[in-house]
Amino acid sequence: MSEEKHEIGLEVLGTEECLQLLSGAVIGRVAFQADGVPHLLPVNYAADADGTVVFRTAEHTVLESVGGRPAVFEADGFDAVNHTGWSVCVRGTGRELTGHDTTARRLLELTVIPWAPGQRDRWFAITPDEVTGRRIPLVRAADFGWIPGVVS
């Protein structure tokens, strides 16, 4: 775990921790541009040990446009009671998985179960150029001399 901090108190996560967090979540968001319009869509996904993110979509959806384009995938988790959380971003290029190469066949073996109803037979991956993450750590108010909700 990285001990590096932003000046605003966020912990910068190392690659290994980012990959571990990605492997434990099942929903994330894919951001990309199609026809000059930015899109940000939620997906069920799986990630491999290298941070490649795999998701499924139906025929004739805007998600098909991610193939061959720059894309960003984001997954996160939070604890609303303790005001902590994390976010991991995978920046890379999207591609459709057709099973015609060894990597595609391996990625198609990952378990991705869409929550939304309907058939989703098109598989896509975002191959990472960069994996980054941040965490909002548990902070005790007393450490900073303030109490939430109290104005002095």
What is each model feature region?
Residues 36, 61-63, 140:
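Short, surface-exposed beta-strand-loop junctions and turns on beta-sheet-rich folds
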Residues 51-52, 70, 93, 130:
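Structural motif
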Residues 2-9, 77-152:
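Charged, gly/pro-rich active-site loop segments
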Residues 54-56, 73, 133:
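Short hydrophobic/aromatic-rich beta-strand segments that constitute the beta-sheet cores
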Residues 3-29:
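Short, basic/aromatic recognition patches
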Residues 30-31, 70-77:
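Short conserved beta-strand and strand-loop elements enriched in small hydrophobics
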Residues 67:
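Short active-site loop/helix that positions an aromatic residue
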Residues 25-58:
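Short beta-strand segments
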